[in-house]
């Protein structure tokens, strides 16, 4: 589908803003650019909308809710993206059931870490951006195009990031144009300036507990043989991160709150059922309960 009236944007009286100034029409294939030119107040503040509240003042960012740890692993024929559920506000727990993993189109998903408000808007706006492009152009973006679109959005947040409002996504997807379907899983990490890196090791993590999660995945990655084993390793990595990072939440058996995960393969992006995640989480906890029993509480340790 293509825009039938190439000159309509700059003359349509129903579209307020710079259209009346005689400026050239915006790139219609980019929804974010369209909003930036026509209705910037609808954009997140960091991406060109009106600045308000803590985003416009330094020193007020410490009490904003922050998302924490996201992990991604490749498996033969796809990739898994998973995240914990905790958000923190300073030294307080702001939320225990926060959703941090979002399916953005048929073959990609993003995980969010950093300032929660900005990160969630990234995920939602990015999903609209991909859908908007496909509706106008009639074809989906290539995976490289999807990476570049997200990098532009991250770069647009640089000014806010320098004030402490950092939000970093982790992009996972399946490249339908890859020559080898078994190796078509893709993981892309970003820095605050919009630079990106295509992971070749097979796993990546972002967030406050990422160093612990990556160490765990490094040791367990040899166990990944399919989607189910990849989900288990992802849950185990989040468990390890929660064990050492207070900002990362592990499986909460009492409240019934577990990590969320998405698998992406040739069949598309699919959310892993909560029942399966709960089952794997219990298996991990049970195995760790046996393996980690040492010290004064170990068998034979009583005097």
UniProtKB/Swiss-Prot annotation:
Component of the proteasome core, a large protease complex with broad specificity involved in protein degradation. It is an enzyme of class 3 (hydrolase). The formation of the proteasomal ATPase ARC-20S proteasome complex, likely via the docking of the C-termini of ARC into the intersubunit pockets in the alpha-rings, may trigger opening of the gate for substrate entry. Interconversion between the open-gate and close-gate conformations leads to a dynamic regulation of the 20S proteasome proteolysis activity. GO terms for biological process: modification-dependent protein catabolic process; proteasomal protein catabolic process. It catalyses: Cleavage of peptide bonds with very broad specificity. Its main location: cytoplasm. Belongs to the peptidase T1B family. It is found in: Cytoplasm. Residues 1-67 form a propeptide. The 20S proteasome core is composed of 14 alpha and 14 beta subunits that assemble into four stacked heptameric rings, resulting in a barrel-shaped structure. The two inner rings, each composed of seven catalytic beta subunits, are sandwiched by two outer rings, each composed of seven alpha subunits. The catalytic chamber with the active sites is on the inside of the barrel. Has a gated structure, the ends of the cylinder being occluded by the N-termini of the alpha-subunits. Is capped by the proteasome-associated ATPase, ARC. Keywords: Autocatalytic cleavage, Cytoplasm, Hydrolase, Protease, Proteasome, Threonine protease, Zymogen. It comes from the Bacteria. Pathway: Protein degradation; proteasomal Pup-dependent pathway. The active site is at residue 68. Its EC number is 3.4.25.1. It holds the Pfam family Proteasome. It comes from Mycobacterium avium (strain 104). GO terms for molecular function: threonine-type endopeptidase activity. This is Proteasome subunit beta.
């Amino acid at each position: 589908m293509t825009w039938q009236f190439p000159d309509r944007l700059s003359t349509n009286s129903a579209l307020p803003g710079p259209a009346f100034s005689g400026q050239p029409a915006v790139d219609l294939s980019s929804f974010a650019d369209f909003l930036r030119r026509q209705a910037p107040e609808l954009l997140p503040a960091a991406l060109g909308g009106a600045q308000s509240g803590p985003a416009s003042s330094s020193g007020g960012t410490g009490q904003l809710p922050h998302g924490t740890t996201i992990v991604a692993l490749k498996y033969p024929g796809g990739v898994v993206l998973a995240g914990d559920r905790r958000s923190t506000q300073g030294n307080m727990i702001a939320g225990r059931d926060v959703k941090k993993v979002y399916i953005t189109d048929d073959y990609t998903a993003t995980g969010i870490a950093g300032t929660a408000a900005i990160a969630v808007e990234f995920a939602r706006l990015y999903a609209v951006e991909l859908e908007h492009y496909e509706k106008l152009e009639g074809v989906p973006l290539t995976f490289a195009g999807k990476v570049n679109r997200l990098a532009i959005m991250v770069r647009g947040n640089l000014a806010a990031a320098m004030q402490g409002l950092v939000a970093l996504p982790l992009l996972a997807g399946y490249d339908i144009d890859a020559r080898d379907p078994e190796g078509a899983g893709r993981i892309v990490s970003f820095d605050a300036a919009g630079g990106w890196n295509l992971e070749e090791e097979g796993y990546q993590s972002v967030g406050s507990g990422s160093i612990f999660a990556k160490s765990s995945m490094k040791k367990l990655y040899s166990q990944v043989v399919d989607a189910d084993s990849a989900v288990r390793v992802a849950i185990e990595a989040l468990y390890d991160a929660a064990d050492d990072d207070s900002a990362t939440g592990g499986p909460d058996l009492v409240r019934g709150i577990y990590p969320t995960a998405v698998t992406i393969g040739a069949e598309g992006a699919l959310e892993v059922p909560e029942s399966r995640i709960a089952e794997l989480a219990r298996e991990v906890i049970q195995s760790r309960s046996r393996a980690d029993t040492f010290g004064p509480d170990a068998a034979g340790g009583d005097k």
